[in-house]
Amino acid sequence: MKSSDIRQSFLDFFVGKSHAIVRSAPVIPADDPTLLFTNAGMNQFKDVFLAKGTRSYSRAADTQKCIRASGKHNDLEDVGRDTYHHTFFEMLGNWSFGDYYKEEAITWAWELLTVVWKLPEERLYATVYHDDDESFRIWEEKTSIRPDHILRFGDKDNFWEMGETGPCGPCSEIHIDLTPDGSGRALVNADDPQAIELWNLVFIQYDRQVDGRLEPLPQRHVDTGMGFERVCAVMQGKSSNYDTDVFRPLFDTITELTGVEYGASMHDPQDIAMRVIADHARTLSFALSDGAMPSNEGRGYVLRRILRRALRYAKDLGYNKPILHRLVATVADSMGDVFPELRDRQDAVARIVKAEEESFLVTLDRGIEIFNGLVGKVRGEGSSTLEGEDAFKLYDTYGFPFDLTRLMASSAGLQVDGEGFERCMQEQKTRARQDRREKQRGGAEEGSWEWFSDLHATEFTGYDGLEADASIIGISRSKKNLLLVLDRTPFYAESGGQTGDRGWIETGEYRLEVTDTQKDGDSFVHVVTRAFDNVRDSEADPADIAVGPGRVHASVDRKLRQATERNHTATHLLHAVLRHTLGAHVQQKGSLVNPERLRFDFSHFSKLTPEEIDAVESAVNDCIRQAEATLKHADVPYDDAITKGALAFFGDKYADLVRVVEIPGISVELCGGTHVDNVGQIGLFKIVGESSVAAGVRRIEALTGRAAEELMWNEYRELHDVRQLLKMKAEEPPAEKVAAILEERRALEKQLAELKAEVLLVKLQGDASALEDVCGCRIVARVVDGADAEGLRYAAQMLRQQFPLSAGLLCSSAEGKVSLAAFASDRAVKELGIDAGKLIRQAAAAVKGGGGGKAEFATAGGKNPEGMEDACRVFREAVRCIVKA
């Protein structure tokens, strides 16, 4: 029975039992930022079990996409080494929401397995919770299972809980005995591949209290799950999930790419590598098609680890090129009928994966070289443990996830100091945290504050106005600055990428200039860098002035705040446009919003083309021209914000009450920053830069409002000046004429270089001592005065063509920089084995430089002109030795 038929027969069976067939939820949870990946069929029904949601149906069945690659439910380390663990798998399941219960769940499971699929009854075992007599009785009286095949187990194996508190209940599992003689009773629940769990039937009937008590739920539910790959192996008579038709297309593609056949043996390193690559290709295809992106944090880092792990295993197949992106199409072809998103996003997923592979392969070989050196060092010291600091260096410098280093170390017979690695990781985080804290305190030392109130919190009034009367509740001094905390303030403190407000605080005696505002816990720290003494009508040192508790008037610089607000609202427009233009995989990875400009980092797999940049810029300006788009701000419960469509990303921390900024019809985001009232106030949006920040992360820099206008006016004036210089009309595009001038210049420069080379060649030919004949081979090694690097190259090429059996090195210097050009004729390379690339590296050492190239021609540079004669001598002697040998 084919895997596709097995899946369909499961769904058809439950349609016959009046179940609604629901679509698989994405593997990226849409409304649960606490969960990395969907890891069970019940995830999408979690709200029902928690009595926070309902469905229009009371019976459901589906095949759910699942990923288990991190945290408690983590199969990553076992993948490839056994027959049945995967990071991606399908979970077949059926559910009852307050409808049927134990009897139907048990009898229907038995009917499907033994009547429809015709699995041998004598090979099946049922486990029940040790005091669940009801389930035991149903198995005994309502099915034809052998009574001695009903086994009782305790909490560890047969009691399901969602968490430390909440919905829970006993479960009944169905296992199959795969031992040759049917003697697997003792292997049930022993994590043995010869007695595997097929189906878990969970009966949710209790609510676990904080004190551990179990209270009956008002409604009882059924939640079942069956591993699709496992049941396919059983139905197809295979001893391994990987031997089924689920994986065969992937192995065929890997064989086609690498030339390595699958099926040598269970423990063969190349078979293990092929299983890992096949599994990881599925995981990446499904995760990325559901909107995930590789990154350095959260679920994105898990995916990056998986990809890099697979690339490391590809080396065991002798394959050193990107491979996973070639498998994306295979996954889509074999599973796209059931999960159409695989085909819909196939090209985009392949591009993302390929970009990630190419990025890591740049450092992989160097990292492996460093790792091998560390292995030699450890063995030389008589140790068997790789230091945590070394593992951290591989992670920090070469992008080696810790589990990849541990895997490589295990293959080398070594262990890795995990505690030491974690210590280095924590030290790095602590340093970063301390740097952030110092900035938030405005540079003040810990404990240097003088407080005038038991409450240190600041009330922010800056959403509604830019001025406020307030009281000073805290003072500190840092170097030449004065730091103030007020009980209320209109100054926005830096957070969410928006820089802190600037402005003034009036005390009566002093006018204090605030040049930054930082947030330290609940306190807003106003950084004062200049002070004006109103009484003496002169400037004062802010670190020395006498300021104590009292009333003040705080006012934000209106012009700067408005410029910041234009830039901040523009980032929301930009984010929405990027998601619409490039795809839903685009997620904000960072931002900087200040009065001068905006910077927006986002997940994307490739450099934006000029056409894409133009399209994004044009779309943002189209949004701005919709001047009727008035922003809406509201503080709402987090769940309501998510329901409204506001984006929430894994790892972000949100309070129960969140601020939602909505640009109607365009964008809904959780954001605590300040914004314009109407998008028309932004005026103009102009992209000034697009670049790479990290693998899979791009950056756009842009200007808005007056800054964007000034940039465009400056560019217009410069273009006008260029047209005048070229004597062109206003309507004529200057690009073609400039290109023609540059092409003409390049041609003239080439002619000049050739003329210089010919002069140099004549000079060398006229100097009898320049060309040495050794056993018929012409050798030249000379310092040439006044020649530039281009002239040296042309002269070397001419000498190479003029003398059929020859080798030479030409050197010159200008402004302390040395240029070298070496050559070897075709006959010198083939008949004598002369290699200009190797020889120039030896010679370059004399001028404190380096270089290289091919055997026929090579170049180098250096910074020691005094060593040029030595370089010539080294080259000449080396060639003599080769020729005479």
From Swiss-Prot:
The keyword Transmembrane does not apply. One of its GO terms (biological process) is alanyl-tRNA aminoacylation. Gene3D superfamilies: 2.40.30.130, 3.10.310.40, 3.30.54.20, Bira Bifunctional Protein, Domain 2, Threonyl-trna Synthetase, Chain A, domain 2. GO terms for molecular function: alanine-tRNA ligase activity; aminoacyl-tRNA deacylase activity; ATP binding; tRNA binding; zinc ion binding. SMART domains: tRNA_SAD (SM00863). It holds the Pfam family DHHA1. Consists of three domains; the N-terminal catalytic domain, the editing domain and the C-terminal C-Ala domain. The editing domain removes incorrectly charged amino acids, while the C-Ala domain, along with tRNA(Ala), serves as a bridge to cooperatively bring together the editing and aminoacylation centers thus stimulating deacylation of misacylated tRNAs. Catalyzes the attachment of alanine to tRNA(Ala) in a two-step reaction: alanine is first activated by ATP to form Ala-AMP and then transferred to the acceptor end of tRNA(Ala). Also edits incorrectly charged Ser-tRNA(Ala) and Gly-tRNA(Ala) via its editing domain. Belongs to the class-II aminoacyl-tRNA synthetase family. This is Alanine--tRNA ligase. It comes from Chlorobium phaeovibrioides (strain DSM 265 / 1930) (Prosthecochloris vibrioformis (strain DSM 265)).
